[in-house]
Amino acid sequence: MKFMAENRLTLTKGTAKDIIERFYTRHGIETLEGFDGMFVTQTLEQEDFDEVKILTVWKSKQAFTDWLKSDVFKAAHKHVRSKNEDESSPIINNKVITYDIGYSYMK
């Protein structure tokens, strides 16, 4: 069964565009076995903060778990972690939610 992981970022108002632009350059996730795709979305009409969701689609939950343990993951997130600890980080909060994909259709 296919698997999806959502990383929901709550951001300082006005910073979503900069966060989304970071994804324009791939950092190796696309090379991993089991990776099927990614969507980076911005929730519309948030008044007090910005919200960005990073949705990754995998062939299986195991493929996602393998990515979390990979050097590719560590390299792509090493600067994110240090910025989160910095008070100037635009990231207020994040939450990871996972899903089994029961059905999908894309044209």
From Swiss-Prot:
Q: Point out the annotated site residues (description: Transition state stabilizer).
A: 67
Q: Which InterPro entries match?
A: ABM_dom, Dimeric_a/b-barrel, Heme-degrading_MO, IsdG
Consequence of mutating residue 38 to A?
A: Slight loss of activity. Changes in heme binding
Record-annotated ABM domain positions: 3-92
Protein keywords: Cytoplasm, Heme, Iron, Metal-binding, Monooxygenase, Oxidoreductase
Q: Give the UniProt record's GO annotations in the biological process aspect.
A: heme catabolic process; iron import into cell
Give the binding site residues for heme: 22-29, 77
So what EC number does this one have?
1.14.99.48
**What broad class of enzyme is this?**
oxidoreductase
Gene3D superfamilies xref list: 3.30.70.100
One GO location term (cellular component): cytoplasm
Q: Where does Fe cation bind?
A: 7
Citing just one GO molecular function, the answer is:
iron ion binding
Q: What does this protein do?
A: Allows bacterial pathogens to use the host heme as an iron source. Catalyzes the oxidative degradation of the heme macrocyclic porphyrin ring to the oxo-bilirubin chromophore staphylobilin (a mixture of the linear tetrapyrroles 5-oxo-delta-bilirubin and 15-oxo-beta-bilirubin) in the presence of a suitable electron donor such as ascorbate or NADPH--cytochrome P450 reductase, with subsequent release of free iron.
Something else the entry says is:
IsdG seems to carry out oxygenation of the heme without the assistance of any of the prosthetic groups or cofactors normally associated with activation of molecular oxygen.
Similarity field: Belongs to the antibiotic biosynthesis monooxygenase family. Heme-degrading monooxygenase IsdG subfamily.
Could you give the subunit structure recorded for this chain? Homodimer.
Its protein name is Heme oxygenase (staphylobilin-producing) 1
Q: Tell me the organism's taxonomic lineage.
A: Bacteria, Bacillati, Bacillota, Bacilli, Bacillales
Q: Which gene encodes it?
A: isdG
